[in-house]
Amino acid sequence: MNTNKIALIYNKNSKHLAIIEEIKKLFNYCKIEDAEVIIIIGGDGELLHNIHRYMHLNIPFYGLNLGSLGFLMNPLDTKKLLQNIYESTVSVLNPLLMQAEDTNGQIYKALAINEVSIFRKTNQAAKFRIDINGVERMSELVADGALVATPAGSSAYNLSAGGPILPLASNMLCLTPICSFRPRRWHGALLLSSATIKFEILNITKRPVNATADFQEFNNITRVTVKSTKDQHIKLLFNKNHTLEDRIIKEQFGE
């Protein structure tokens, strides 16, 4: 991507301000609204927060890793920064759309790039029913919770919960239980990205749950519907020798 219209986003309280100042000297950056590329400096958390904030602009994001986690980021190389951006490859992500209803009947909608999760709010395990495309597939799951992950998010919370890593182009979603108690040996399911997943919370008074879409959390939820969005696209830029697809493969071999 050959462009001189580059915006720069970073945490003003970052402990890496000296490095950031060096990066700022490499080019004349512009306003975010005028940019053709947005560089986000930090870690995966900083990237996700700013993607949520600016995804409506349909501008590609280039993450530059100065954080502790950087799976969706590019390594810092100030000498080749502009060259890496110009020669970068594009990964297109479709976020998940979560619709959740709480005990007061309030409806919440939120997008998730990595995963939507539901989790017990107290020491009591959660109980819920799972429907896929309008068909009941599990009458009762007893667990700490469950999550639905995108391919890009499958190597994050989903992997820690015992779910599989998905290739980026798989057009699949992971449905993964979190510390499942009943059925004890159920490890989840792989679903087409066109699937609609619905969780109906059981015994909500005694066993309340929260729902999250990435970092957005909603309390005392009675039902959650999750599906992949087709009208919302996020473009992430990666160095040509450090693509997201390659990282997903490496993660499966513990590299």
From Swiss-Prot:
Places the protein is found: Cytoplasm
GO terms classed as biological process: NAD metabolic process; NADP biosynthetic process
Class of this enzyme: transferase
Assigned EC number: 2.7.1.23
Domain of life: Bacteria
A GO-annotated cellular component: cytoplasm
Keyword field contains NADP: yes
Annotated family: Belongs to the NAD kinase family.
PANTHER family the record matches: NAD KINASE
Family matches, as HAMAP family: NAD_kinase
Protein name: NAD kinase
Source organism: Rickettsia typhi (strain ATCC VR-144 / Wilmington)
